[in-house]
Regions:
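Outer-membrane pore/translocation modules
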Residues: 1, 77-78, 83-91, 99, ...
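Surface-exposed strand-loop-strand hairpins of Gram-negative outer-membrane beta-barrel proteins
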Residues: 1-13, 136-139, 335, 341
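Residues that define the transmembrane beta-barrel architecture of outer-membrane proteins
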Residues: 5-15, 45-49, 100-104, 143-149, ...
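Outer membrane beta-barrel
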Residues: 6-131, 145-147, 154-162, 256, ...
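Sequence/structural signature of outer-membrane beta-barrel proteins
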Residues: 34-40, 72, 90-92, 126-136, ...
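Outer-membrane beta-barrel pore domains
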Residues: 54, 164, 168-170, 179-362
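Conserved, well-structured beta-alpha core segment at the onset of a catalytic domain
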Residues: 130-140, 144-149, 153, 233, ...
């Protein structure tokens, strides 16, 4: 958890540039580069979040090829564009749990009109990587999503947007050599003559989640923005048979415009599906084995996300292209539920975060 009274400019600061070029009415080129705080070791190309060609064979069909945003959430198209939403940041309970910003591949969308409603069906296929800190140390883990595919259905009418997403991917975690050395020591215990020890070692490796696995993702979202009222709600479910990433998360938000000001509130919740991991007693094997069991159990439990968040704030649109926001977040973090915070911790906490941002476009 953050130390008391820490002030930083890094958490929500970012600078982005977009470029669009219309080759002809059927072909468009687009790119977006976002500079923001990233984990050490991040490659420069990770800052390139768009780099694609969009082809429109008809007014109803669009095909994009290249690097695009994974259209998995309500805010996928503009999650880095602060002036586009009322809060200081999107719900951390849902969006921080799935920090996937880019996908390399292709998507095809088809749009049609039905009376006053506009529908769109999009399918996608590609791959993407995202970085995270290891639950057991300061080592990083790169989650590689391969053969990712899915479909999104949206409906817009009179200021209301409804959407549903269903997708899947093959996922593998890649980390430092020291992490794999620990895994090899754990695997050696899976052939221990004591069947209890062997089973405990297999369970620890499964819950550690370093091996290739299938990830399933489902999302439902709804938003309304008309006249003086804005509200939204979103639910996401991630199912992975190994590791601690299986979870469900949701948020609801309500806002009211009063002249140039918008006041809002948001409630969020994130729940890991993995039960608390008990520490095996391997003291009879060796001190090294017990240390390994303790460290892995601590890291697995420390990467579980079980928290609730209440956010209250206001936004002042003092210029057509600028907005000043102030937001207070209060978190209820359960024991062994701090997976959305930096560094593993098994303790419960109720931190507060006060944020102020100036969002602008030019």
């Amino acid at each position: 958890y953050p130390s008391d009274h820490v002030t930083t400019l890094e958490t929500d600061s970012r600078f982005g540039l977009q470029a669009h070029y219309e080759v002809n009415p059927q072909l468009e080129l687009a790119s977006q580069v976002v500079h923001k705080r990233r984990l050490p070791g991040s490659k420069p190309f990770e800052s390139v979040e768009w780099l694609y060609a969009a082809f429109k064979p008809t007014d109803a069909v669009m095909v994009r090829v290249g690097r695009t945003n994974p259209d998995l959430f309500l805010l996928s198209d503009y999650r880095n564009v602060g002036v586009a939403y009322p809060w200081v940041r999107p719900s951390t309970d849902l969006y921080a749990a799935l920090p996937l910003y880019t996908m390399d591949g292709t998507d095809v969308s088809y749009a049609w009109q039905q009376q006053d409603a506009r529908w769109r069906l999009k399918t996608f296929l590609g791959s993407g990587d995202t970085r995270a800190t290891s639950a057991t140390s300061r080592e990083q883990v790169i989650f590689q999503l391969r053969s990712a595919g899915g479909a999104i259905l949206t409906r817009e009418q009179d200021g209301m947007l409804m959407r549903a997403t269903l997708g899947g991917a093959r996922m593998k975690a890649e980390s430092a050599a020291s992490v794999y050395a620990a895994r090899d020591r754990l695997r050696s215990l899976q052939s221990h003559p004591d069947p209890t020890v062997a089973q405990q070692a297999r369970e620890l490796e499964k819950n550690w989640g370093l091996e290739t696995d299938t990830a399933l993702f489902a999302e439902l979202g709804i938003s309304y923005d008309r006249d003086d009222w804005i509200w939204s709600a979103e639910y996401a479910l991630v199912r992975i048979s190994s590791g601690t990433r299986s979870a469900q998360s949701a948020y609801v938000s309500l806002g009211r415009r009063i002249g140039d000001f918008t006041v809002y509130g948001m409630l969020g919740r994130s729940l890991s599906k993995l039960p608390v991991q008990n520490t095996p007693d391997w003291t009879g094997i060796s001190s090294d084995a017990q240390t390994l069991a303790t460290q892995l159990t601590y890291g697995i439990n420390g990467s579980r996300a079980r928290q609730s968040t209440l956010s209250l704030g206001t936004r002042w649109d003092f210029h057509p292209q600028m907005a000043l926001k102030v937001q207070l977040d209060h978190f209820w973090v359960s024991p062994t539920g701090s997976g959305l915070w930096v560094g593993p911790s098994l303790s419960a906490a109720r931190p507060n975060v006060l944020s102020a941002t100036l969002d602008f476009t030019f």
